[in-house]
């Protein structure tokens, strides 16, 4: 089985919160697609709560679209990582890490501005597979933590795993 790009970086050296360009590719028609690693937590040291990450999933994508989409950028998807340390964001376009970090911070402030759980979009049994597993309070705690710590930038060249580790 081929090794996925996300497993070629050393998770012990990742900073968080931080943005990383995980992958870039071009469609057959020439559109640029960029996948970002939006790392909320230091891998193997911190983890996002289940209810908090689920509520973030419902809120974060909409707010990021509000602040990042433009004539050159369109977000395709923002999905939580299985390890619960962040999200992957796939988009059409090539914004830089700083633009993404700024949109992320503004989105976290937007989450703090939500007054009650009724404002969470798609929070019902028809549109959500586990609609009872949400916590606005936990999502807001995560957002506050991001705003308090700030968002840095992780570079792939600083995180590449040594070939000996890849083959062990």
From Swiss-Prot:
Binding site for Fe cation: 54, 58, 128
Signal peptide residues on this chain, from the entry's feature table: none
Annotated GO MF terms: iron ion binding; S-ribosylhomocysteine lyase activity
InterPro entries xref list: LuxS_sf, Metalloenz_LuxS/M16, S-ribosylhomocysteinase
UniProtKB keywords: Autoinducer synthesis, Iron, Lyase, Metal-binding, Quorum sensing
Cofactor binding mode and count: Binds 1 Fe cation per subunit.
Enzyme class: lyase
EC number from the UniProt entry: 4.4.1.21
Stored SUPFAM superfamilies: LuxS/MPP-like metallohydrolase (SSF63411)
One Pfam family hit: LuxS
Catalytic activity: S-(5-deoxy-D-ribos-5-yl)-L-homocysteine = (S)-4,5-dihydroxypentane-2,3-dione + L-homocysteine
Cofactor dependency: Fe cation
Gene Ontology BP, a term: quorum sensing
Lineage: superkingdom: Bacteria
Complexes and interactors: Homodimer.
Record family assignment: Belongs to the LuxS family.
UniProt cross-references to HAMAP family, sorted A to Z: LuxS (MF_00091)
Function: Involved in the synthesis of autoinducer 2 (AI-2) which is secreted by bacteria and is used to communicate both the cell density and the metabolic potential of the environment. The regulation of gene expression in response to changes in cell density is called quorum sensing. Catalyzes the transformation of S-ribosylhomocysteine (RHC) to homocysteine (HC) and 4,5-dihydroxy-2,3-pentadione (DPD).
Protein name: S-ribosylhomocysteine lyase
Lineage: Bacteria, Pseudomonadati, Pseudomonadota, Gammaproteobacteria, Pasteurellales
């Amino acid at each position: 089985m081929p090794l996925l790009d996300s497993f070629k970086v050393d998770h012990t050296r990742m900073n968080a919160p931080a943005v990383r360009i995980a992958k870039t590719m071009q469609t057959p028609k020439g559109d640029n697609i960029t996948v970002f690693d939006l790392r909320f937590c230091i891998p193997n040291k911190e983890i996002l709560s289940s209810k908090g990450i689920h509520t973030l999933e419902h809120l974060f994508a909409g707010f990021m679209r509000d602040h990042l989409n433009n004539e050159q950028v369109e977000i395709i998807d923002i999905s939580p990582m299985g390890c619960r340390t962040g999200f992957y964001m796939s988009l059409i376009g090539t914004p830089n890490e700083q633009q993404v970090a700024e949109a992320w911070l503004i989105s976290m402030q937007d989450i703090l501005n939500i007054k009650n759980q009724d404002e969470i979009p798609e929070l019902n049994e028809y549109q959500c597979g586990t609609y009872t597993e949400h916590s606005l309070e936990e999502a807001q705690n995560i957002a506050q933590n991001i705003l308090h710590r700030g968002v840095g930038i992780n570079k792939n060249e600083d995180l590449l795993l040594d070939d000996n580790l890849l083959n062990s």
